[in-house]
A protein has these predicted regions:
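Extracellular/lumenal glycan-associated context and N-glycosylation machinery
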Residues: 1-63
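Short, solvent-exposed secondary-structure boundary motifs
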Residues: 8, 219-221, 346-347
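Secondary-structure junction/capping motif
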Residues: 9-13, 73, 258-261, 320-325, ...
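Short coil/turn linker and secondary-structure boundary residues
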Residues: 10, 114-116, 213, 302, ...
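Intrinsic-disorder/low-complexity, polar/charged segments
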Residues: 13, 28-33, 92, 169, ...
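Short hydrophobic/aromatic-rich motifs at helix boundaries and adjacent loops
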Residues: 19-21, 38, 51, 173-177, ...
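An amphipathic, basic-hydrophobic helix/alpha-beta surface used to engage anionic
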Residues: 44-295, 338-342, 356
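Acidic, glycine-rich A-domain
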Residues: 268, 274-404
Length: 404
């Protein structure tokens, strides 16, 4: 995005500060010992740097290219195109950030453009490394020049921000898909029958007796020399619901620091599961904290990216009411085959959801992060030992979990 509205900014470089201190020193020295020649020379250098620097101050148009998202702890380049809009050359141009957001670290210095002719464009890249997931406003950098003597720095400050979404860490897991192929539909409208949704093309296979002639793939037939039929992702057997708990109990809160390892592990595990099952199962419903998100009308790739974006913003909470989103989720369980719980603690709301999933014919899997010594026990519908898998936050964050 191009930025032309800016304010002039004048600062002293380290060398300029030393020269200014020397000038002040000789000023007071002349009160005792005649040293007007040295003082005059120093003042002349400062005035020359001020006048020349002001005349040749950078007047550039900055065009920013910031990626929409990046995974936490991965380096990313922020690219800036500098176009000299003045009628005189600009020298020693450099980009400098006044202050990066907490959680974003600049890696290494930025390059310097030694000379930029009028109308010429140069590109500079700034490498940053996000330390925490979340949504960040990246401020526009100051385009500054310390020409001619590297004593004073003239710059232009642009008051604008670009949003950067930092996604949680995720990696591929070996997830069994045997439950995703179970026929669990007991009624309702299938995915392809919804008016606002079109079936997603999956590929083709050999034509079998009983297949609809309307789905014959003529191109594949010509290529393979055998009848072939089109396949679509239009059944509810490969649908899942993902539930991520963000209520952090006191036993999981660290004594110091803002980052909660258990919550980060839960979010990372949720992102990894969504990524790993994406080719075999689509996440239709995501209950992230108290918010229920529905992705029925989204196609496969943008759906996964949207889920990761939502998980990037999950915040810790001491408590929230789950009755309304839980009721909305329970009414949709007949449309999915698998319900995956990622919990920090257990309460009766999740017990009720687990029972509702069992009555709907869904298979449920519960991952309890840093589980307490005693679980919730058994209910009339569900056996704790059959569905709950205790996992360690350290194992998740270090990538030691390879198979679920």
């Amino acid at each position: 995005m191009a930025r032309t509205d800016a304010t002039i900014r004048l600062t002293l470089t380290d060398a300029g500060k030393m020269l200014l201190l020397g000038t002040v020193f000789f000023f007071f020295t002349t009160m005792v010992i005649p040293a007007f020649g040295v003082l005059t020379a120093l003042l002349s250098v400062l005035l020359t740097a001020l006048l020349v620097g002001f005349v040749l101050r950078p007047r550039v148009r900055v065009t920013e290219t910031v990626p929409d998202s990046v995974v936490v702890s991965q380096n990313v380049k922020l690219r800036y195109a500098l176009e000299n809009t003045a009628g005189v050359p600009a020298y020693d141009l450099q980009l400098q950030f006044e202050k990066m957001p907490d959680g974003i670290e600049q890696v290494g210095p930025t390059a310097v453009v030694s000379r930029l002719a009028p109308g010429e464009t140069a590109e500079l890249a700034v490498t940053v490394r996000p330390q925490r997931r979340g949504y960040y406003g990246i401020p526009s950098p100051i385009c500054q020049s310390s020409f001619p003597f590297n004593l004073l720095s003239f710059g232009r400050r642009h008051r604008a921000e670009q949003m950067l979404t930092v996604l949680p860490v995720f990696y591929r897991l070996q997830c069994p898909v045997r439950h995703f192929s179970r026929h669990v539909r007991t009624g309702g409208t299938g995915f392809a029958g919804r008016a606002e949704v079109s079936p997603e093309y999956a590929g083709n296979r050999p034509f079998l007796p009983g297949d609809s002639p309307r789905r014959i793939d003529t191109r594949a037939w010509a290529r393979l020399s055998v009848p072939a039929t089109k396949e679509y992702h239009n059944d509810s057997d490969s649908r899942a619901a993902l539930i991520v708990d963000s209520r952090v109990p006191a036993r999981l809160r660290p004594s110091e620091g803002d980052e909660i390892p258990a919550l980060e592990a839960a979010v990372s595990l949720a992102a990894s599961i969504a990524f790993s099952i994406n080719q075999n199962c689509l996440v239709d419903l995501l209950l992230a904290g108290p918010e229920l998100h529905e992705y029925t009308s989204w196609l496969r790739s943008p759906r996964l990216h949207k889920i990761h974006e939502v998980l990037a913003g999950v915040e810790a909470a001491e408590g929230y009411d789950l009755d309304v989103p839980a009721a909305a989720l329970a009414s949709r369980l007949y449309d999915v085959a698998e319900v995956i719980f990622i919990l920090l603690d257990w309460d009766k709301t999740y017990t009720q959801l687990l029972e509702s999933a069992a009555r709907a014919g869904c298979h449920s899997t519960v991952f309890l992060i840093d589980a307490p010594a005693q679980g919730p026990g058994e209910t009339d519908e569900v056996n704790w030992a059959d569905v709950v898998t205790p996992v360690s936050s350290d194992d998740i964050l270090t990538g030691r979990i390879e198979r679920l």
